[in-house]
Amino acid sequence: LKACYTFFLFGCGSLALIVIYDTQNNSSRYFRIWVIYMSKFYPIHLDVTGKKCVIIGGGKVAYRKACGLKESGADVVVVSPEVCSEMVNEEGIAFIKKEYEECFLDGALLVIAATDNEAVNKKVTLDAEKRGIIVNVVDHPEHCSFIVPSTINRGDLCISVSTGGASPAVEKRIREELEGAFGKEYEEYLDLLTKMRSLA
């Protein structure tokens, strides 16, 4: 791993202290400190292939979530009276251009609430919980039954980074470090290992 930052994690109960030492500047020392809540979430990779995944909202955040689910093979349904221009031009996504209604969750594996309307997001959460559907409310981890981590993908290698929603800045910083440490060559390396394993 490239020697740019040194991370220290001190935990006690549900609280954690993260100290990051910046080693990029040789003449001075820079420290950054975050106090965060330890994640209550169980890390898991979910197979969404061919599964209905609903996104409530039509903005750029909703667009990014929709693209991520589509790339993973999900049947993506976006519910919003209006959608951003990027969403309009995206193929492979079904649109329901209406205000949110509970019936739009029929048959869904998961739902993501990505609107700027707190009342709508709350209703989506309650409806999903009532139906036993896992739900994510963007930027509100306290209302989520699952969260979406930052990921680095190198072929079959997938590295996930999450602070449980406590500090997106820390999450981004760590992800960027890992992106540098695990380059594109890891995709070829894992392909080779897979072929070698099949011959064993």
Indicate where each model-derived feature is located.
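Short, Lys/Arg-enriched N-terminal segments with co-localized hydrophobic residues
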Residues: L17-Y37
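Hydrophobic, well-ordered beta-alpha structural blocks that scaffold small-molecule cofactor pockets
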Residues: V35-E82, M87-V88
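Residue-level detector of alpha-helix initiation sites
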Residues: G59-V61, A119, G165
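Glycine-rich, highly charged phosphate/nucleotide-binding loops
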Residues: E91-D106
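ADP-ribose/adenylate-binding Rossmann-like module
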Residues: L110-A114, N121-I147
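An accessory alpha-helical subdomain
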Residues: G165-A200
